[in-house]
Design a protein with these regions (language model features):
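Bacterial Sec-dependent N-terminal signal peptides
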Residues: 1-18
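Short, surface-exposed loop or secondary-structure junction motifs
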Residues: 63, 117-320
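Short, well-ordered beta-strand elements
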Residues: 316-319, 328-332, 336-346
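Short, conserved catalytic-motif segment at the N-terminal edge
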Residues: 19-76, 100
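Short, gly/Ser/Thr-rich active-site loops of penicillin-recognizing serine hydrolases
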Residues: 285-290, 343-364
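Short, glycine/proline-biased beta-turn/loop segments that scaffold the active-site neighborhood
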Residues: 100-115
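A short acidic/small-residue loop/turn micro-motif
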Residues: 60-64, 243, 347-349
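Active-site SXXK
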Residues: 31, 45, 51, 75-102, ...
């Protein structure tokens, strides 16, 4: 009887191992179809459930000059995925009573002249429902290449109109997240980067993530690339593409290793409370098909996170990052304790098509 039970257990284990190998092979096919040249710009991919690795692969080059290969220690520009870190900072300050998410922008920016800033709250800027238009001077090439979180929002001082009443619609806009840089500094008296390092990154156990500065050394730095008209790869990041210097909305460089630490800190409530997490993962506004950025069926926006609810599927919480040649997906399924990280140094890919294929392979 005991021998029979052992034989059954062994057979079941073998079947599970065989299934895991098949799943990994199917996922490999998806990524190998895109990253099929080891000497071209590449990507890092990690899928974990709990502490178990479902899939982990690195492809291609992080730097085409030095020929450094992509690894899980490679620091990618995660672009707009940076927004969730800034949102967590504001929620920490709300937890401490330093500010309220219902505080109006006029409390922190008395220099903003229009009366409607009294009606726009921190909740609105974190959920992309403020109505503030993106009126940055994009025709000024020097501005878009080298502006920072302060200069990028100067147009709001004399802004005289909104695109819609706050809280009534969704419009994805980077400058409202850039405001968080000054809100943190004005509310705490602490430089933004210092606050983030001590209260967010260190608490999460993140070791090498850094905000971009032109003269700052970042270990294992990846570069983004695009193909030129001759089909050759050329670098396309700072100096070639806009707004690499704005920190609160998009200038964080982070590795897969550090992002796993971040996800664990979010899951285990080490950087926020469970109540704050529920707020962040709540879809405050549904994204309509005519939205310029972020629409997917069944998707809304929380605080720094897209939240997708589809019939017969578990809820997906994620964000996208796009800047220069970098194309980033940082997603999770909280109820399954599953994370899916896909960081790429090239943009010529169908990112969400790839993501959806992988979720389908995983029956998610």
């Amino acid at each position: 009887m005991i021998l029979a039970m052992l034989a059954l257990a062994s057979a079941t284990q073998a079947q599970d191992m065989s299934k895991d190998v098949m799943v990994q092979a199917e996922i490999d096919k998806v990524f190998n179809a895109v990253y099929n040249n080891p000497d071209e710009p590449g990507a890092a991919v990690l899928i974990m459930q709990g502490d178990d690795v479902i899939y982990s692969r690195c492809f291609g080059l992080a730097d085409m000059v030095t020929k450094e290969r992509v690894t899980f220690a490679t620091n990618f520009c995660i672009a707009s995925v940076s927004k969730q870190f800034s949102a967590v900072a504001l929620m920490q300050l709300a937890e401490q009573g330093v500010l309220s998410l219902n505080d109006p922008l006029s409390k922190f920016f008395p220099e903003f002249q229009a009366p409607f800033f009294k009606d726009i709250t921190l909740h609105h800027i974190m959920s992309h429902t403020s109505g503030i238009p993106d009126a940055r001077p994009r025709d000024d090439r020097n501005f878009v290449l080298y502006s920072n979180d302060v200069s990028s929002v100067q147009y709001m001082r004399t802004l005289d109109h909104l695109n819609f009443m706050p809280g009534t619609q969704y419009e994805y806009i980077n400058p409202t997240f850039q405001l968080i840089y000054q809100i943190v500094e004005r509310a705490t008296g602490i430089p933004f980067e210092t606050y983030m390092q001590e209260n967010v990154f260190d608490k999460a156990g993140m070791k090498t993530c850094r905000y971009f500065e032109p003269d700052r050394d970042i270990a294992h730095l990846a570069h983004g690339y695009v193909r030129d008209d001759d089909g050759l790869w050329k670098e396309y990041d700072y100096g070639e593409e806009s707004f690499f210097g704005t920190k609160a909305d998009g200038a964080l460089y982070c590795s897969i290793n550090d992002f796993v630490s971040w996800e664990r800190a979010l899951r285990d409530n080490r950087v926020w409370t469970a109540a704050s997490k529920r707020l962040a993962y709540n879809p405050w506004i549904q994204i309509q098909p005519d939205a310029e950025y972020g629409y997917q069926p069944g998707t809304g926006y929380g605080y720094g996170f897209f939240v997708q609810d589809l019939p017969q599927h578990p809820t997906r919480v994620y964000h996208l990052g796009d800047n220069g040649g970098f194309t980033i997906y940082a997603g999770k399924i909280p109820e399954r304790d599953l994370i899916f990280l896909f960081f790429s140094t090239r943009p010529d890919i169908d990112r969400l098509g790839i993501v959806n294929k992988v979720y389908s392979i995983l029956n998610l």
